[in-house]
């Protein structure tokens, strides 16, 4: 341990204590490097004041790392060569494990001190970065339990839904690359889904035009599991686990009464039914619910739905139906549009909610029985308490693989998952050209949907089972989960 005489100032509270009392608390410590450090310190009260001079144990490795970074920064200011820095961002819809990928990038970056200087994070994605918002993640890693990212849901850095211009000569690219140069960025990692890979594609192509040696790598993320050229995406396994687990509880609640009823559960999925398909995992040896499962890949017909529901009610008193938000008829009209016109998001995608409510009203009118609709909504994409341990681990490894790829000279690529079932479930991490991935969509395989379009085959169950294995080990304080304080609250 490295012992140093420093000034210790009490944080927030003044405590009444005698001169003999010892207290363990959190304080702001100012050392000779002028770095503010929040540490667990032990001290004795000497006078009636909140400022004390005392000896505090400081981790020697953290001190050395801080000195090294300051020396690198000073060298850069003086015009000498600097180590290239990392810039990482998160974009699109959050997931339960997107921060595990962020942790992987940070951890692998810090591990390569001979090649990488500082790890920076975009606050609110590329949009926030354009506004000058970023954070020094190396400092966060030095002073906080950075591995807590793996149990922190949603996007620690903050997210955005911002599309870079199609015109690669637009001034926004000049601004971005000027800022990259000012920050001595050598590696940019963007964690996200389809539209995020579009950002990686554009930035890597602009770099080529500008003859920039900055390397751009995409790290996959989406609960929709709709990215092409990869077996699956981080975030999907946890969402599948959440959907199956929550559906089991909903089914028990919905079936505990002796009178006929229908419960319609609406799940995320605009054009791909991967999330809704996971509802099949909720079935047990004593209940076939959900009896009916409808996804966007199969045209939805109101009359056929009525017939199928009638048959289900003849076999089961209480029937649970699962539907994707994006189910549509044979003409491509969304069922949610039957009642109201759909609004549009920033990418021009129709914002789909309400098909569950529409079907609820339809069932009440046609069958005259109790019916309620439920939207699992945000928790299905970012609930960390039901996150899959497999998903967390794979997301972290994807982040690490991205750094390794960039240091190997790769750019304009996305990390891919390659399944190997030779000796049980195993994933290898590969690379694919991001231009072959962005703006494309992987549909749920038609052969995994029954001919009537109301059920899922066993092939899917074999595919998804390994992705939901293992349980997240959360940290608790006062009975509720503890997460790492998000960058946008700092």
Give the location of each predicted region.
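Glycine-rich oxoanion-binding loops at beta->alpha junctions
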Residues: 132-186, 195, 234, 248
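N-terminal phosphate-binding or glycine-rich loops at protein starts, especially the Walker A/P-loop
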Residues: 83-134
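Cysteine-centered motifs
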Residues: 28-29, 41
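Accessory alpha-helical/coil subdomains and C-terminal extensions
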Residues: 179, 187-192, 198-207, 233-372
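Short, Lys/Arg-enriched N-terminal segments with co-localized hydrophobic residues
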Residues: 45-81
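A glycine- and small-aliphatic-rich helix-loop capping segment at beta-alpha/alpha-beta transitions
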Residues: 103-112, 135-142, 202-215, 232-239, ...
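C-terminal non-catalytic interaction/assembly regions of soluble proteins
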Residues: 336-490
